[in-house]
Amino acid sequence: MKKPVVSSGKVWFQPPNKFRREVKGNSPSLTVSDGHQLWIYYPNFKSAERYSLGKRSPLDSAIAAINSALNLEDVENTFTINARKIDDGYELELTPRTPSMKSVFRKLNLRLNNNLRAERTEMLQLNGDRIVTIYSNQTRAPLPASTFEFTPAPGTDVTTPLGR
């Protein structure tokens, strides 16, 4: 693919393993994790994928890694870190330490501003693809528990791709 796929949306994180990602545009999706289940909903297709977390799910380490990096919690135990100071913040190259994380991605580049807030991430996947996310309008306000809940609408086709 010569042209990158570009989308916009919103993302919320709550350590250690809760997040919500709403993607808008031609291919909208909603991804929600409450720490026990991960849902990916595709409104255009009225379909949802449900993944169980915990019990050594292959998704656990990926979710933990991203949350760890963005919240700078236990990041030194999760990644090998190569960092440098830049004019308006810091750039960190985070390489996964564990085999389970290494099976999900090669590295995560994280750009932080001087207030240590994430501005940009770039994840290098195993196949060479890159996922770049730019963060803005950040807040540390408390989030209601419902932010990390998902119930499929009636008529939604629900699958469990990992069979759990």
Label each PLM-derived region with a short phrase.
Residues 7-9, 15-17, 34-36, 47, ...:
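A generic structural signal for short beta-strands and their flanking turns/coil linkers
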Residues 64-82:
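Anionic-ligand binding region
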Residues 40-67:
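Acidic/charged, solvent-exposed loop-and-adjacent secondary-structure segments enriched in E/D, K/R, S/T
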Residues 5-9, 29-31, 47-51, 106-108, ...:
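Short beta-strand segments
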Residues 23-25, 42-44, 122-125:
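Beta-turn initiation residues at beta-strand->coil junctions
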